[in-house]
Amino acid sequence: MRARRALIAVCVIAAASLLSACGEHTMHNGDANNDGTFINAGNVVYQLQVSRELNQYSPEDKSYFIGLPKSAANLTASQLWFGVFLWAKNQTKDSRRTTDNFDIVDTLGRKYYPLKLNSAINPYAWTSTPLMPGATQPNPNTTAGVGPTGGELLLFKLNTSIYNNRPLTLQIRAPSGNKVWATISLDL
């Protein structure tokens, strides 16, 4: 009789622990050592294509700065340009919108926000986009989709002190509010 009660107690505890995880939201994290990791965020799958320092005077990088507001175009001696190129896919059966709410956080907790690029003239600029089931951002038939990065650009102006405060973390947030859907560790 004691063995039977013990078995029932073990089964009840096991069932309770399994059920306690139901409904929990798990934040997904990506690692900078593996560009290309798929991250689920808000019913859309995001993938870091490339993240790197950019040079506005380099012929290779010059087109990434098209559509940058003149008020944000200059760097101080203690700033640098940093680009995060993302790809996204809707793997659901319903239309979904990608987010445009991102930030980078360093190990001291300082936040950096992407600069708004004019997507009407910059074919690499990331913008929130509705995706039909199976659709991707960027569209594979666009400049960003066939370009060297395979992703659309989030352009950041960072302090050079970030080299001392690595790794950096890209936070993918809900379109409105501060809820963090997922994070990706970035390195320089």
Q: Language-model features: where?
A:
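Conserved functional micro-motifs across diverse proteins
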Residues: 22-188
